[in-house]
Regions:
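Domain-level signal for Mg2+-assisted phosphodiester chemistry and nucleotide/NA-binding surfaces
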Residues: 2-103, 144, 154
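Nuclease catalytic cores that cleave nucleic-acid phosphodiester bonds
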Residues: 68-168
């Protein structure tokens, strides 16, 4: 899986202070898009290595839906061991068979809260609804936003809003 972008390396020069970053991961979005595109899971360890290299993590949150099964609890434990705070919403199955577990508002609120303490926001999602958030963070806080997403499954509006798009 391609994870590295030929753009900015994120490496600091000796003596420069570490860039303070906030990492926000839309777990459902990245799970389904990597599964559909590559037939496998997103590599959270590799992502963490790349996104945090020579950077200071101010906050790292993974937003997920809780179905209450053991396999998911184990996955959530792994995310916590990597360094993420895991925020959960209950999985709601509607009478018509559709499901609900959307974190868009929660991710947006946290981005606006923590961006003021960061030099960079890193968002992992392909959801075009976040294009407005990315624009707002860049404008209101004057910080760059890196978006990690799966090519072909990441909204063009989100890619265009980002300071840097990193294909997963």
């Amino acid at each position: 899986m391609a994870l590295y972008h030929p753009g900015e390396s994120g490496l600091k020069k000796t003596g420069d202070p570490l860039k303070k970053i906030v990492l926000l991961v839309d777990v459902q979005n990245i799970y389904y898009t990597t599964r559909d595109a590559y037939g496998r899971h997103f590599d959270y360890n590799r992502f963490w290595e790349r996104a945090t290299a020579n950077r200071q993590v101010v906050k790292a949150i993974a937003y997920a839906v809780d179905r209450g099964d053991e396999k998911q609890r184990q996955f959530q434990t792994i995310l916590r061991a990597i360094g993420f705070e895991v925020k959960l919403k209950p999985f709601i199955k509607r009478a018509d068979g559709s499901a609900k577990g959307d974190w868009d508002v929660g991710i947006t609120l946290d981005a606006m809260e923590y961006a003021k303490h960061a030099d960079l926001l890193v968002l992992v999602s392909g959801d075009g609804d976040f294009a407005l958030l990315v624009d707002r963070v860049r404008h209101d806080f004057g910080i760059p936003v890196e978006v990690y997403g799966v090519p072909g499954f990441t909204a063009f509006a989100l890619i265009n809003a980002a300071t840097e798009y990193v294909p997963v």
